């Protein structure tokens, strides 16, 4: 063992839960030198020696009922973490979150690193989507992945100094000198945006002709946000392309380190600003997992209803703009009018439209208003007829069919390799929907179907979105008909302040109330994560608590980060016009990609 390798503690007792069977398979293959970490989750977290991580990952990728998807990969600076009893010594920890559809289970592999030797072998030879995840870990933590084909910054500019998710890097702007940009600095920054093909391994031409390089974005209507993709063109054919992200990066994971558990909620629905309350869900449920909070049944159903309202709103926008990018102008205007009906309901319930920040740890901010049923019933009566009109106007339109059929097509194997979830995966015939596979918030009590298509092309992706609107209406109808009575928030000291009369009678209760309200509640030490089906795919908040009022580390796995990474594998060899259709049918919000 090298001096900088980390020794494993003694092996841990066998866990009998089905998801932990893979641990015994690992021990059978590699011996006992693994450490299984106790977390609040229902799947194993296994520490592996750095020297064996490649073969362990390869084994998990090829084992019977394999872990076909690298769902997430990131790191954590552990140098200031106080409550890590029994864990392997580690300055920086890299984790690999793997997903198996056949097992319907996950495993998290962790590797401990010494701060003087932040080197790991790349996993891009096992899962191609490790490329961007490893670049992000390099960008944010300075971890070097040996053998990576293009290890460079991804969210921050190339000239950036430091690695922001390290603990010595301040989270507050007041810790730095004011930002001033003069002409020289502007020229310097603009020069670093210049695309040099050789830096990306691209050739300027071949023996017969020169290629043209075209910047699409970062301010282009078809990019659907602050996103640049550089195209290597031979005429109209895309020979290769380089997606360039980070223009919308706000450092939301760093922000979480200086917000209390409650005050971070408004930041979550700004990750995907079209997702609204659906974006609150994985965060609050991860915190509830940490705190052991049981959410009342009424609050669970209210959450489901709000989630599905925002799913409808997102999908109406998606379908309208996708059809518009294919040349159909009419549907988008009607769909925007229908979205206002959904916003009216959301505003009546939450008080806001786009950024309600309405879910709370333990439930919701308040109960449903009087006569909420009337607005919901009006939507349920209105939308089915409109959907029939949209289907006829768009999905039977020969122009739309011609522009989307067999365009930007990929199969299920490719989707899994690139970490695609949501409608992009279901358009290839795989019905993975977290609401069905791993029901949460009472979804197991609802009768709904998971729409799938099998062609994996642009038409299939739009059609799956459209069919999901029908299923969301079906779920909302069940919420309307079966809304339980009872409290809308858990009566738990980490979720709500104590009753007012008790604070006036008992000094200890008053002190607890004062500390909880002024400083925020202290969550138990440990780790928890929760996966939900947000409007664009599967999203996870992975939280590390150091028994403090704020998160020690918040990892946000968003679906669209890896969806954009897939672009070159799908579009190379196609036409520029096909790329426009592909971008329109990915369903992307750049704040969700860049965080």
Swiss-Prot record:
NCBIfam families: NuoC_fam, NuoD, PRK06075.1, PRK11742.1
Top-level taxonomy: Bacteria, Pseudomonadati, Pseudomonadota, Gammaproteobacteria, Moraxellales
Name of the protein described by the UniProt record: NADH-quinone oxidoreductase subunit C/D
EC numbers on record: 7.1.1.-
Catalytic reaction annotation: a quinone + NADH + 5 H(+)(in) = a quinol + NAD(+) + 4 H(+)(out)
The UniProt record lists the keyword Translocase: yes
Entry's family note: In the N-terminal section; belongs to the complex I 30 kDa subunit family. In the C-terminal section; belongs to the complex I 49 kDa subunit family.
Organism per entry: Acinetobacter baumannii (strain ATCC 17978 / DSM 105126 / CIP 53.77 / LMG 1025 / NCDC KC755 / 5377)
Record's function text: NDH-1 shuttles electrons from NADH, via FMN and iron-sulfur (Fe-S) centers, to quinones in the respiratory chain. The immediate electron acceptor for the enzyme in this species is believed to be ubiquinone. Couples the redox reaction to proton translocation (for every two electrons transferred, four hydrogen ions are translocated across the cytoplasmic membrane), and thus conserves the redox energy in a proton gradient.
GO terms under cellular component: NADH dehydrogenase complex; plasma membrane
Main subcellular location: membrane
Subcellular location: Cell inner membrane
Gene for this chain: nuoC
One Pfam family, short name: Complex1_30kDa
